[in-house]
Amino acid sequence: MATLYREFKPSVIYLTNGKKLNQNLTNVFLKNSTLVYLKGTYTMEANMQTIRRVEFDDRQYDVIEGQLAELIDSVGNDCVYRVDYLDMDAYQAQLKNNINISNISLGDQISTSTVDLNTEEDFKFPLVHKYYMCYNGETFPVHEREIWRRLPKDKDIRRMFKTIITKQGFSWTSDESVSELLRAIISVSKTEQ
């Protein structure tokens, strides 16, 4: 099963009705970035409509569009989140590439052997990252056009935005770049007030 952690681990789950649950055996299912938990010998998928936040010992997730979004950075109430998905096409290709099939002709006989080269230690799940920004109380996908629409009409803020996103090394798929962008927007917005 494609999960974030090798082993299921404890978490604190905050529900939309205000209740708080301590769950011993939970994990993040990477196929659709949802919470899964163990109930006896069964792995169950949580109803994401009832969950507001999940806290593991090393990460915090808020639910955005029905998926667990990891909190990457925050300044006050403004935040950057990342949703990690399993890239199913790359995953299938990786599985196929890691199986070695050889056909050796021995007269009229064909010997076929299959060796599974997938070991848990070596195997890395191919992930796709989607970023979200919470700015001025509104949560939206991190995309140039989406951010531009929500920026104040101030020339300095818009110039700073263009400068950052055209800077060498900036990437829309990098935690550091997206965090830097959020912090710059917040700092310039505060100096303009």
Regions found by a protein language model. Give the residues of each.
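Exposed alpha-helical structural elements
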Residues: 49-52, 67, 146-147, 156, ...
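Flexible, solvent-exposed short loops/turns enriched in glycine
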Residues: 128-162
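Generic detector of short alpha-helix boundary/capping microenvironments
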Residues: 5-6, 125, 169
